[in-house]
C-alpha cells in the first residue's frame, strides 16, 4: 500500500497495483510519472486522475463514450507497443474535462484522450493529429463539434 495525499479526497491508502505509470508524463506535466484513478463522486460518471507526487495535480476525467457513443479512437501501433497492449479489452479511454461555472458549460478534450492499459497499469495521453474532434467539445452537447476536417 502507498499513502498519497489527494486534492479532493485527502489522504488515501492506495494498493500498488492501482498505480498507473505514465513513462512520458502528460504533456505540460512531463515530470509526473505516476497517477491513480479514483472515482470523483460515487454515482457519477466522473473520475479523478490524481498525481501520486503532486497533491494539487488532479485531472477530472470521463469515459467519453458515455457522452458521445459515436466517438472513435484508433490507437497507433507505437502506442500499442509503448503500453504493451495485447488485448483490446484491457484498454480504457478517458477524456480530460475543463470544468466551468456553470457546470453545464464544461468542455471535454476529445482530441487528446488518456489511454490506459488496465492490465499493465500503463498510460499516456495520446494526441490525435489526424482527427476532426475538438479539444473544447461542450460536454452536454449531444452533437460532436468538429474542429477541422480530418486529414
Swiss-Prot record:
Pfam families: FliW
Lineage top rank: taxon: Bacteria
Cited InterPro entries: Flagellar_assembly_factor_FliW (IPR003775), Flagellar_assmbl_FliW_dom_sf (IPR024046)
Keyword Cytoplasm: yes
UniProt subcellular location: Cytoplasm
Main location: cytoplasm
Record keyword Chaperone present: yes
Any Gene Ontology biological process: regulation of translation
Keywords: Bacterial flagellum biogenesis, Chaperone, Cytoplasm, Translation regulation
SUPFAM superfamilies recorded: BH3618-like (SSF141457)
Any one GO cellular component localisation term in the record: cytoplasm
Family that this chain belongs to: Belongs to the FliW family.
Matching PANTHER family: FLAGELLAR ASSEMBLY FACTOR FLIW
Function: Acts as an anti-CsrA protein, binds CsrA and prevents it from repressing translation of its target genes, one of which is flagellin. Binds to flagellin and participates in the assembly of the flagellum.
Subunit structure: Interacts with translational regulator CsrA and flagellin(s).
Protein name as it appears in the record: Flagellar assembly factor FliW
Organism, as annotated: Halalkalibacterium halodurans (strain ATCC BAA-125 / DSM 18197 / FERM 7344 / JCM 9153 / C-125) (Bacillus halodurans)
Taxonomy of the source species: Bacteria, Bacillati, Bacillota, Bacilli, Bacillales
Amino acid at each position: 500500500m502507498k499513502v498519497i495525499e489527494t486534492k479532493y479526497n485527502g489522504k488515501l491508502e492506495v494498493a500498488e497495483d492501482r498505480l498507473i505509470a505514465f513513462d512520458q508524463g502528460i504533456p505540460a506535466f512531463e515530470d509526473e510519472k505516476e497517477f491513480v484513478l479514483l472515482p470523483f463522486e460515487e454515482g457519477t460518471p466522473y473520475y479523478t486522475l490524481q498525481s501520486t507526487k503532486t497533491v494539487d495535480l488532479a485531472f477530472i476525467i470521463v469515459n467519453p463514450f458515455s457522452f458521445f457513443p459515436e466517438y472513435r479512437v484508433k490507437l497507433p501501433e507505437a502506442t500499442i507497443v509503448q503500453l504493451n497492449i495485447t488485448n483490446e479489452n484491457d484498454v480504457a479511454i478517458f477524456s480530460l474535462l475543463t470544468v466551468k461555472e456553470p457546470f453545464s458549460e464544461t468542455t471535454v478534450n476529445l482530441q487528446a484522450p488518456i489511454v490506459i492499459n488496465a492490465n499493465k497499469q500503463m498510460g499516456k495521453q495520446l494526441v490525435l493529429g489526424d482527427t476532426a474532434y475538438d479539444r473544447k467539445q461542450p460536454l452536454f452537447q449531444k452533437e460532436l463539434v468538429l474542429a477541422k476536417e480530418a486529414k
